[in-house]
């Protein structure tokens, strides 16, 4: 089962600000591991909190990918990408 990976505007901006080597590593993770996974939840961890329950985080080195998984559409919507120290602040 192939999942479709999509980016919202904020995550596109986040990705463009990253060093090119880190950006390639993140896109490779999304393409080679997450998109082809039978269950994208098995690779990540649910964010805690009442407002954050629908979001999942994925760890790629010191960087985190915050995404929303839509089972009905087989889609993973990436909403934020950033360093683990800063990605949760906004």
Which residues make up each language-model segment?
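Enriched for short, Lys/Arg-rich terminal
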Residues: 2-4, 9, 13-17, 24, ...
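Secondary-structure boundary motif
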Residues: 17-20, 36
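A short, surface-exposed loop/turn module that caps and links secondary-structure elements
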Residues: 32-57
């Amino acid at each position: 089962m192939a999942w479709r990976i999509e980016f919202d505007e904020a995550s596109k901006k986040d990705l463009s600000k990253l060093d090119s080597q880190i950006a390639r590593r993140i896109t490779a993770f999304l393409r080679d591991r997450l998109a082809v996974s039978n269950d994208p939840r098995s690779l990540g961890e649910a964010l805690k909190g009442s407002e954050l329950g629908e979001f999942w985080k994925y760890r790629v080195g010191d960087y985190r990918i915050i995404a929303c998984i839509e089972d009905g559409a087989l889609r993973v919507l990436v909403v934020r990408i950033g360093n683990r120290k800063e990605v949760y602040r906004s």
